[in-house]
Amino acid sequence: MRLISLLIIVPLVYSCKKDQPEPIPIDISLSSGLVVLCEGLFQQNNATLSWINTGTGGISNDLFEEKTGRHLGDTGNDLKKYGGKVYIVVTLSSTIEVMDATTFAPLKQIEMLNGTVAKQPRSIAFYGSKAYVTCYDGFVDVIDTSSLNVVQRIPVGSNPEGLYIANNKLYVSNSG
């Protein structure tokens, strides 16, 4: 009886294996899918940028790391496309990541520091050739979208959060 049990159990155990799902090839282009920014957990440095191909259902759960070889950072808060570029605002890392909107190739990491103090950028809006970024240090930083350099700082009060541009005016909401 013991031999029969072994003859049944041994082949069953060795025939079991985990199936590895075939990766679904994904065509990465803004016209064929969605980009999703996941904020990540506070102070865990695990924000991600995912890609969902709406035609095939293919998903890339960390497109940013695939394209750059590094983590996006801590607390991704805003994502906008403007002028052929994608801008990702990462608050606690105090960076703005700029990528090509077609290929998602990295173009520049803009460090948002005042000396060595983190500005903690929050939101971004665009007008003309400028990007406007709220920073928790009480300013809106103006970035030239060609050079990708900060060209001006505008004082706006405590903890600016959102911003909106209409009729040649910049509106900023403060939370402090």
Regions found by a protein language model. Name each.
Residues M1-L7:
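Sec-dependent signal peptide recognition
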Residues K17-G176:
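Predominantly soluble domains enriched in secretory-pathway, periplasmic, or organellar proteins
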Residues L12-S15:
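C-terminal motif of bacterial Sec signal peptides marking the signal peptidase cleavage site
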